Amino acid sequence: MTAHLATALQGNAWLAEATAAVESDPAAITTLFPAAGRGCGRAPLPGEPAGPALTTWTADDAARVVLLARLRLPRAGLVATVHRLYRDGDAAERRAVLRALPWLDVGDECADLLHDALRTNDPRLVAAALGPYARHLDPAAWRQAVLKCVFMGVPLSVVDGVEQRADAELAEMLDGLRRERAAANRAFPDDALAVLTLAQQSSA
C-alpha cells in the first residue's frame, strides 16, 4: 500500500527529500510531518478513484503515511513517535497517523489512538479509525463505533471488515436505533439497514 502511495506522488521533489531525511535521521519527521501539506499539497491523490469524501486520499495524507513507513526505529521508538505525532498534530495529521497504522510495526500498542479518535465528533477521524487497524478494537468498542457512524451520518462503507464482524449484538443495537427512529418518524440509513440485515442473517 505504501509503495502505491509513493508511486502516486512520484516526482514530488519535496517528498523525495523528506523521505531521504527521515531515513537518515528519524527525528526529522518531527518537522517534516506537519509540513507535508505545504510540500505536497492537499488535493486528492492523483489516480484516486471516486468515492466518499471521507475515504478519499489526499496528497498530504499519502506523504505523511510514506514518511511514517520509512522510519527506521525499533518498535518501542516507533510507537512513541506515532503517539507524539498524533498528540501534537492537527486533524489532518491525526488522520494520517490513523491511516498509517495498518502498515506500521506497532502491534496493538496504538489502539488507544483509535479510542481517542472515536471519542471525537470529527467524521474524518472516526472514519480513519475504522480502517484495517480497527481489528484491534474489542467487539464492544467496535460495535459502539459502528453505531456512532450511524448517528453521525458516516457511511458504513468506511468500516473495514463490517461484513465479517457484524453479529447478533450489533444487530440488536442497530435494530433498537431503527425502532427509535421509526417512532420519531426519522429515516434510518440504507447502509445501516443493510448491515442490520447482514448481522441478523449471520447470527441466525
Task: Describe the predicted segments one by one.
Residues 1-74, 141-204:
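N-terminal alpha-helical scaffold/docking segments in eukaryotic complex subunits
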Residues 63, 67-173:
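Eukaryote-skewed repeat-based solenoidal scaffolds used as protein-protein interaction platforms
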